[in-house]
Amino acid sequence: MATIKVTQTKSSIGRLPKHKATLRGLGLRRINHTVELEDTPCIRGMINKVYYMVKVEE
């Protein structure tokens, strides 16, 4: 399965609780933290929810 790299680029302070939970679900904890995840529809949906706080590399 293909993988993608997701990096948190903005702080989660002051964001909606659901968006904070989504970042946690992606495994992101702080700014510039990068995780490598499988490219699945579920993960893509989570990324789309917090697109303004993350950067994605294919």
Curated annotation (Swiss-Prot):
An example Gene Ontology biological process = translation
Which molecular-function annotations from GO does this UniProt entry contain? Answer: structural constituent of ribosome
Q: Which Pfam families match?
A: Ribosomal_L30
| Gene Ontology annotations for the cellular component aspect, listed alphabetically | cytosolic large ribosomal subunit
The record's InterPro entries line, in alphabetical order, gives:
Ribo_uL30_ferredoxin-like_sf (IPR036919), Ribosomal_uL30_bac-type (IPR005996), Ribosomal_uL30_CS (IPR018038), Ribosomal_uL30_ferredoxin-like (IPR016082)
Print the keywords alphabetically: Ribonucleoprotein, Ribosomal protein
* Database matches in NCBIfam families: rpmD_bact
Instruction: Describe its partners and assembly state.
Output: Part of the 50S ribosomal subunit.
Protein family per UniProt: Belongs to the universal ribosomal protein uL30 family.
- Tell me what this protein is called: Large ribosomal subunit protein uL30
Q: Which gene encodes it?
A: rpmD
